[in-house]
Amino acid sequence: MQILPAVLEKDGKSFTRQIKNLSHYFQTFQVDVSDGKFTKNKTAQIDEITESIYKEKLNIKHLTFDFHLMVYNYREEIEKIKKLSKLVNVGYILIHKATNPSLDYLTSSRNFSSGLVLDIKDKVDDLPKKYNLDLVPIIQIMTVNIGYQGTPFMAKMLEKIDDLKELGYKNKIYLDGGINNQTIPLILNRKYRPDGLGIGSFLTRNENIKQTVSYLKSL
């Protein structure tokens, strides 16, 4: 399983501080972006992140950022990400199913690879009604109510991995939300495991970072 630090910060300065702290251990990150409307919590915006990287003259082109867009206007955010892509490698763009992105938009060529995010209320069985899942490169399953780090893990959401596999989905499956040393055993005990784990406060708010990284990389 790939481990991705999920970076959810309130401003550009806090964001770059986290990247500098964690880039000693990781090359790929998941950047949480919330507009304060799709969720109540507003994070550092992409323009702020870009400005902070420029201001601090960070040389991080070797790092890859996936973007988890907790926003209504994902098209506008993707235009901002295009500008940021001059400074970092951009991996996956993760768009919430609730914002109703079309399959054509997800699969069209825009230099980035886009996938779906399933919220707590989203049902896997509804996906084939709108999407050819063979063409969706990644699906991220939320295991918490979105917007804040440190909210309770919902183990029942792990059943969605089974549901996707039973539908014949063969592309990447990520989990995000409430993942730590208490909940990881629940994930590892499943018949099907995810391809990636977005790790938030367990990494970003942890005082024993070296020990935590060692544990995560041993999975």
Positions of predicted regions on the chain:
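A short alpha/beta connector and helix-capping loop motif
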Residues: 37-74, 78-80, 184-204
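Active-site/ligand-binding-proximal alpha/beta "capping" segment
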Residues: 140, 145, 152-190
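Catalytic cores of alpha/beta
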Residues: 15-22, 73-85, 121-133, 179-197
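Alpha-helix-loop-beta-strand connector modules within alpha/beta enzyme cores
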Residues: 45-67, 115-119, 157-173, 177, ...
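Glycine-rich phosphate-binding active-site loops on the catalytic face of alpha/beta enzymes
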Residues: 97-99, 140-149, 190-216
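Generic structural signal for well-ordered alpha-helices
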Residues: 15-20, 47-55, 78-82, 103-106, ...
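Catalytic beta/alpha-barrel core
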Residues: 6-10, 28-42, 61-105, 112-125, ...
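Extreme N-terminal starter segment of soluble prokaryotic enzymes
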Residues: 1-4
